[in-house]
A protein has these predicted regions:
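Bacterial Sec-dependent N-terminal signal peptides
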Residues: 1-52
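C-terminal domain-boundary segment and adjacent tail
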Residues: 324-335
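Short, surface-exposed beta-strand/loop micro-motifs that present aromatic residues
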Residues: 288-294
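Low-complexity, compositionally biased segments
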Residues: 8, 24-27, 196, 291, ...
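Chitinase-like catalytic core of GlcNAc-active glycosidases
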Residues: 52-285, 299, 303, 308, ...
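Polar low-complexity intrinsically disordered regions
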Residues: 1-22, 142-165, 335
Length: 335
């Protein structure tokens, strides 16, 4: 009797196990949400707004590119690693890790071009104003063709230039190289990383770039930006569209100094990087910078370093805190 009961119990347990397993094999429809599709009027309004006077948003963005030292290009499934996944209302993107081109980074390049044409987002490359001895081909402006042309020596070889703070011509040639790079790569401007140059060298480069990107140059719509930490360069105010106060690391305290630069041209940044700990994904102090205004006038805008960290915002909304900062500075108009 005892064995019979054990056997019966075993049969019941087996039946239950089979029953549970049969339930697991039933297919359940998985709901996949499609991306929201906007009409042409939405994008037209977005582009028009970005061309209007307003406090801008700015990011340093590197997630589009492979890690430093790795070859090839990325074709990521996550929109957190796609340029096209950045917020529509974002104004300016500083391209960390290089410049995407059709040959080197086709996915990122297509995303960039789409964002430029449809969303009116502007992309600048990262120019170095921290070191000297850069080497590049010398070039000059050709009025006849309205383009740059390489300088050649008596043998017909292209002249190579190296930046030297004691030689003004090398700095002006470096500025022409930067402007030519912007035009050849289809970018919207250059952002010089000012972390070691002297004021005079930066002013020379700014003055030369202004010949091409300034109001009287052939491409006045292009941006000339300087980002700085510790001290902002003198002598560039008339040439510069924006001065970006850097934040490679999370800032302790609330930094609102301009370094003596015009308030309305100053963009205040914070870091969403790993050193910010839990504050990084939450957006650090970006909303505080969005809310803050000087006693008179207005700021140029606010921005973020390592904005890709905020893609996984605790709210579940990609770039949730950064989007909130955009709305604080420039509330959407609902009609």
């Amino acid at each position: 009797m005892k064995y019979k009961n054990i056997f019966s119990a075993a049969l019941l347990a087996m039946a239950a196990f089979v029953g549970f397993n049969s339930c697991d094999t039933d297919t359940e429809a998985e709901v996949i949400q499609d991306l929201y599709k906007y009409d042409s009027q939405y994008f037209e309004n977005l582009r028009a707004w970005k061309q209007s006077p307003h406090e801008v948003t700015y990011v340093y963005y590197a997630a589009w590119a492979p890690l430093e030292g790795q070859a090839g290009y990325k074709d990521p499934a996550s929109w957190g690693e796609r340029i096209i996944g950045l917020p529509d209302s974002l104004d300016i993107v500083n391209l960390w890790m290089g410049i995407p081109t059709p040959a080197t980074h086709p996915v990122a390049y297509q995303d960039m071009v789409y964002c430029q044409k449809e969303k009116g987002t502007r992309f600048v490359f990262h120019g170095d104003a921290s070191h000297f001895n850069h080497t590049f081909y010398d070039r000059v402006w050709d009025e006849a063709t309205q383009s740059f042309k390489y300088v050649t020596d008596a043998k017909g070889d292209t002249v190579v230039i190296k930046t030297d703070p004691e030689k003004e011509y090398t700095l002006r040639s470096y500025a022409r190289w930067a402007c030519d790079t912007v035009m050849k790569c289809g970018l919207d401007g250059v952002d010089f990383d000012y972390e070691g140059w002297d004021n005079n060298s930066m002013a020379i480069v700014a003055n030369e770039c202004d010949k091409f990107f300034g109001p009287n140059g052939p491409w006045p719509e292009k941006l000339f930006i300087i980002d700085w930490f510790g001290g902002a360069p003198d002598g560039c105010d008339d040439y510069c569209d924006y001065f970006v106060r850097q934040a490679y690391t999370w800032q302790i305290g609330f930094q609102t100094g301009t370094g003596g630069r015009p308030q309305e041209k100053t963009i205040y940044c914070d870091s969403f990087g790993g050193e910010a700990g839990e504050a990084g994904p939450r957006g650090a102090q970006i909303c505080d910078y969005a809310r803050w205004e000087p006693a008179t006038g207005h700021k140029g805008g606010c921005g973020a370093y390592y904005v890709d960290t905020n893609y996984k915002d605790p709210s579940g909304i990609p770039y949730g805190e950064f989007r909130k900062a955009i709305q604080i500075m420039n509330p959407a108009v609902h009609k």
